[in-house]
UniProtKB/Swiss-Prot annotation:
GO cellular component: ribonucleoprotein complex; ribosome
Iron recorded as keyword: no
InterPro entries, per database record: Ribosomal_bS21, Ribosomal_bS21_sf
Domain of life: Bacteria
GO biological process: translation
Any Pfam family matching the protein: Ribosomal_S21
Stretch list, region Disordered: 47-66
HAMAP family: Ribosomal_bS21 (MF_00358)
Molecular function via GO: structural constituent of ribosome
Protein name per the record: Small ribosomal subunit protein bS21
Length: 66
């Protein structure tokens, strides 16, 4: 459950904070994934591709750090 405090009736900043928290929690991605049924075989391939992408990104970061 995501909680956001409203200070002095400032709704604009509250909405910004709420959207940031939703993005940090990967809420939008989960909603998108659950919109349609995805077979386990397709889900497994997608997860493997995402892991490979993260691994390459981490390797690039390490290359520039050294």
């Amino acid at each position: 459950m995501i909680l956001v405090n409203v200070h002095a009736g400032n709704c604009d900043n509250t909405l910004k904070n709420f959207k940031k928290k939703l993005q940090r929690e990967l809420y939008f991605r989960k909603m998108k994934e659950q919109r349609y049924y995805e077979p386990k075989s397709v889900k497994r391939v997608r997860k493997a591709q995402e892991a490979a992408r993260r691994k390459r990104k981490f390797a690039r970061k390490r290359m520039y750090e050294d």
